[in-house]
């Protein structure tokens, strides 16, 4: 069988971005960390699933820590030093993801909770009976 041709697409140029925003979306099933510049352009991202966790383990605090470390490492390579942290969602990986960003060497200037709260909007799903 013939070998598939290797694609050599445009490589992303390393930019020097000193300030940015870390968006942490933490649900009960997964944690997604996106690090953007101040205008909102994504510089690096990672999730518990992308870090190698599957199934129920994606919702654990350790998976969130691993995802945050991976995203922070890539952001540090782009020259990022200071970040604001916006946390969204009720998941268990919120605090550990913030701590992992700090331990990785990023200076956190602000932590803001941006979890959306309905002003009595849509009807809630019925309660689970387990």
UniProtKB/Swiss-Prot annotation:
Task: Give a Gene Ontology cellular component term annotated to this protein.
Answer: ribonucleoprotein complex
Q: Does the keyword Flavoprotein apply?
A: no
InterPro entries, alphabetically?
A: Ribosomal_uS11 (IPR001971), Ribosomal_uS11_bac-type (IPR019981), Ribosomal_uS11_CS (IPR018102), Ribosomal_uS11_sf (IPR036967)
Q: Which GO molecular function annotation, any one, does this entry have? A: rRNA binding
Q: Which UniProt keywords apply?
A: Ribonucleoprotein, Ribosomal protein, RNA-binding, rRNA-binding
| Classification via SUPFAM superfamilies | Translational machinery components
Q: Name one Pfam family in it.
A: Ribosomal_S11
Q: Could you tell me the Gene Ontology terms of the biological process aspect for this record?
A: translation
Could you tell me which HAMAP family the record lists for this protein?
Ribosomal_uS11
Q: How does it assemble?
A: Part of the 30S ribosomal subunit. Interacts with proteins S7 and S18. Binds to IF-3.
Function of the molecule? Located on the platform of the 30S subunit, it bridges several disparate RNA helices of the 16S rRNA. Forms part of the Shine-Dalgarno cleft in the 70S ribosome.
- Stated family: Belongs to the universal ribosomal protein uS11 family.
Q: What is this protein called?
A: Small ribosomal subunit protein uS11
Q: Which organism is it from?
A: Parasynechococcus marenigrum (strain WH8102)
For this protein's source organism, the top of the classification is: Bacteria, Bacillati, Cyanobacteriota, Cyanophyceae, Synechococcales
Q: Identify the coding gene.
A: rpsK
């Amino acid at each position: 069988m013939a070998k598939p041709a290797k694609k050599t697409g445009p490589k992303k140029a390393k930019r020097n971005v000193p300030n940015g925003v870390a968006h942490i979306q933490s649900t009960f099933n997964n944690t997604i960390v996106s690090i953007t510049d101040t205008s909102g352009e994504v510089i690096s991202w990672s999730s518990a699933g992308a870090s190698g966790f599957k199934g129920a383990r994606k919702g654990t605090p350790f998976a969130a820590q691993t995802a945050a470390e991976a995203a922070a490492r890539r952001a540090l390579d782009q020259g990022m030093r200071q970040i604001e942290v916006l946390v969204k969602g009720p998941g268990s990986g919120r605090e550990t993801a913030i701590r992992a960003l700090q331990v990785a060497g990023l200076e956190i200037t602000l932590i803001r909770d941006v979890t959306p709260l309905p002003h009595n909007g849509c009807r809630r799903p019925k309660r689970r009976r387990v």
